[in-house]
Every structure is written in C-alpha cells, then in structure tokens.
Amino acid sequence: MKLRDFIEIDYILFFSIITLLILGIFFIYSSGVTSTGNLVSNEYIRQIIWASIGIAAAIVLSIVNYRKFYDIALYLYLFSMVPLLYTFFFGRVVHSTRWLRIGSFGIQASEFAKIAVIIMLARYLADTERDNKSFFRFFICCMIVFIPMGIVLSQPDLGTALVFISILLSMTFVSGILMRYLLFIGSCIVFSGFFLVLPLWQTYIFRKNIPAIAALANSKIIILAALFLFIIAAIAMFGFLKFKKRYFYWLVYITAIMILSLGASYAARLVLKNYQIMRLIVFLDPNVDPRGAGWNIIQSITAIGSGGLTGMGFLQGTQSHYRYLPEQSTDFIFSIFSEETGFLGGLVVFALFFIICQRLLRIMKTTTDPFAVYVCAGLAGMFCFHFLVNVGMTMGIMPITGIPLLFMSYGGSAVLAAMIGVGLALSIHIRRYSR
C-alpha cells in the first residue's frame, strides 16, 4: 500500500466504526455482570477477538483493489449459497437452523451471504446500466436477492430475510429503476404484513369474530380469492395488449400485488414458528402475554426509560444486572446502553450511525465507478436498516425480529461480515477517482 493510499483512507468512517466496536465491547461486558458484581460471561473476550479480526480484515481489504471483487462476483455469490444450503439441512441451534457449528463456534452463514449479494447485484446493475428502465433487469435483480433470501426465510429467519429486501430496494433505487417497480415490492411487503397480522389482531387482541378478517386465515378462501384476482388480471392483461389503455395496466399491477400479498402472508403462516408469530402479536400489544412473549419488549422499554437523560452509570443498570432483560448482549444491547448512559448516550450512537451512513453516501457520490456506487448503496441500505429496526425493536415501535445492532451487538459473524463491507468501502474511497 502506498503512503498516498494510506493518507486517503476515510478516517472519519473508520474511527466511527471503531468507536461503536469499543462501546459494544464495554456493554457486552456489562451485560455479563450480575447484580452482585460477579462476571458470569466471557462474551466480551470473544467479541474483542472478532472485532480485532474484523478490523484487520477491513484494513487488508482496503489495500486490495475492490475491482477484484467485480471479477469474482458470480463465484462469491454461488459460493455463499453452499453454507446457506448446508445450514438449512444440517445446522441447528435452539429454535432455528441459522447457525453452522465449527467446534465451539457458531457461524451465521446468512451474514456473509448479504455481502455476496451486494457484490453480485452491484456487478449486474453496473453491467446493465444502459437498460436501467427494463422490467427484465428488475426481475433479474429480484432473483439475485430472492434466492438466498428464500433459503434464509425457510430456516426460518425473518429478520435477516428482511435485510435482503433493504439491500434490493436501496441498490435498485440508486440504479434508476422505475419507481413503480420499487413501489410494487414495497406494496407487496406492506400488504403481506397486513394480511398476516390482521387475523392475529382479531384473535388475540380484539377477541371478536369479524368474518372478513377471519377469511384471511382460511386457506380455501385465500386460494379462491387468488384465483378470482388471477382471472381479473388475465382479462386486464388481454385488454392492455389489445387496446393499449393504461387503466388495464394498472389493474394488472394492483391485482398482482394482491395475489402475491395473499400468497406471501399464507406462506408466512406455514413457515414461521409459534414464537415468531407471538412476537408479532406482542408487538401489537405486549400485555397480551406480559410474562411470556411480551416480556422482552416490556423490559426493554423499561430499561431505556429508566436511563433518563444521563443514565444510571456504567455497571449500575438494574434491568440488565438483575437479569430481567433476555438476549441483552445481542438483540437488546441498545437497551443496556441507554439504561446506563441515558438519552445523551443514545444520541451518541445515533450520531455515529448517521456519520457512517453519511460517509458511505459521500463515497458513493464521489466515485466514478458504477460498480462502486452500487456497493456503497447496498452497504448504506444494510447498515441503516439494521440500525433502524434494532433500535425500533428495543423501543417497541418495531416487532422483535432478531436483527442485531451492527458493530455493537455480540456476534462474530455479524461483526466480521460488517467489517468486510467496511473494508470494501475504504478501498472504494481510496480509489474513488479511478476505475
């Protein structure tokens, strides 16, 4: 690496991430201390090891020309499918099949698949820039993302599957793909969630039978409704091809959204485990099961609220040290952090993530290479989604999905994969004016 390249590293991005890693290690340590002051977990030591490996990987990748990943994008993508499939068939940890066991370590293959998808999708978008309005181009983009996403969702890991959607939307938006295509995906997600949650709301919260809502949980009615909508779509498609009227096109568009949303919501009921269904229910009302599925949300909100403006002090939190808050070193690390550092500490984390995303967008804006632009867009979308969903989850404004707070939550796979992405961004920044 030349001295000039060393000087060109984006130190603001790099040290913002180092700061988050250090904060994460301190509060992973805090999560392992009981109310009597005993340390009952060595997770912080493992996190130090993974963070060190991740920092080294980021530095090494910043030295390597990122264009080499353009050349091997397809191979990386196909290779990432192997551990995903192996995990699906053979990996088992607690409630899901998300982890590969290697000795005493668990490897989350889906974390590395995100990076492979970003690289592969960036190459395809860069290679097809001249055809950026094509529906076929958007369809291929969806297939690149939906194949690994489908494997992850079937494990089932809803949270990680949603991260793939954020990558797809952010990268295709930057590529200039027609907004109606992005709106189609977004509408399918919204209506799928609506059709999935509404019967749960009726059963567990409203507790009164509404036939129209109950029908959304009836497989026979869903199939009949989908067939009816399909017939309407077919007639509308014929009308559009024959008469070239735009209202036929939009009728096909809307009915397709409804068909896919009904199908996706029904498939979700078959795939999701009972504990995942309960997470959706307690998101609507945690008091439905305050000592069961709603416990995490209630205790997390209590922890954040008890922190006040300046926090209770390092190692002084009650929710964490009295072990009221489960998964406190992973999903709910922000809850512990806010309890002990308060609102002002939470603002620091918000500011650091804002800086990281701003620096990625700045690199994206200044680089002259389309491949680099799309890689940065995918990384920014992934980092922002992780942050917004995890923090929203701890505050009770998002359902619990198991998405970690990148760079702070305990987890070697997430840290290492994220730092690989950071290394790519640093490499792009160094070479942003050359192709």
Where are these regions (language model features)?
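Gly/Ser/Thr-rich beta-alpha loop segments that engage phosphate groups in nucleotides
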Residues: 26, 56, 161, 296, ...
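Flexible extramembrane loops and terminal tails that flank transmembrane helices
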Residues: 1-13
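Glycine-rich, flexible loop/turn motifs
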Residues: 2, 89, 95-98, 103, ...
